[in-house]
């Protein structure tokens, strides 16, 4: 029996040593969307201009800034996401009159953004015109 035990154990050992190679699946051709772009390929995002004006804030964001610390103190063990959820619940509960305060702040911030954006766009336009005029003067030399 000892000889059969040895042969039985050696066969199980040899099975353990054999590595199974993973089956490679053939690569799928990328799907082409209606616009002719290949799906799955990421397009490169152009970098944000650091001089561009910051976008205006919504009424809820102004509300969140005011109430986040209060909720965080009353729920110290909550995660950032849970606090955000609680803020959303509080925002839904407050009256329309209370929301008007934050809507007014948001409207003022939007006016600020529109003015800054207008100035920023004009600045970009003058820069591009200056560059194009300097390019044309270089060609005439």
Curated annotation (Swiss-Prot):
GO terms for molecular function: chromatin binding; DNA binding. This is Non-histone chromosomal protein 6 homolog. GO terms for cellular component: chromosome; nucleus. GO terms for biological process: chromatin organization; DNA repair. InterPro entries: HMG_box_dom, HMG_box_dom_sf, HMGB. Residues 1-56, 117-141 are annotated as: Disordered. It is found in: Nucleus; Chromosome. Residues 1-12 have a biased composition (Low complexity). DNA-binding protein that induces severe bending of DNA. Required for DNA-binding by the FACT complex, a general chromatin factor that acts to reorganize nucleosomes. The FACT complex is involved in multiple processes that require DNA as a template such as mRNA elongation, DNA replication and DNA repair. Disulfide bonds: none annotated. It comes from Dictyostelium discoideum (Social amoeba). Residues 53-121 bind DNA. Keywords: Chromosome, DNA damage, DNA repair, DNA-binding, Nucleus, Transcription, Transcription regulation. SUPFAM superfamilies: HMG-box. Belongs to the NHP6 family. Its main location: nucleus. Transmembrane segments: none annotated. Probably associates with the stable spt16-ssrp1 heterodimer to form the FACT complex. PROSITE patterns: HMG_BOX_2. Residues 17-46 have a biased composition (Basic residues).
């Amino acid at each position: 029996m000892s000889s059969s035990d040895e042969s039985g154990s050696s066969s199980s050992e040899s099975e353990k040593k054999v590595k199974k190679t993973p089956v490679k699946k053939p690569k799928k051709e990328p799907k082409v969307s209606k616009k002719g772009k290949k799906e799955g390929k990421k397009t490169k995002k152009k970098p944000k201009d650091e001089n561009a004006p910051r976008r205006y804030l919504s009424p809820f964001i102004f509300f969140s800034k005011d109430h986040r610390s209060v909720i965080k103190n009353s729920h110290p063990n909550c995660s950032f996401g849970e606090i955000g959820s609680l803020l959303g619940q509080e925002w839904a509960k407050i009256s329309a009159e209370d929301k008007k305060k934050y809507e007014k702040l948001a409207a003022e911030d939007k006016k600020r953004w529109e003015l800054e954006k207008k100035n920023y766009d004009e600045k970009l336009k003058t820069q591009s015109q200056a560059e194009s005029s300097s390019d044309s003067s270089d060609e005439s030399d």
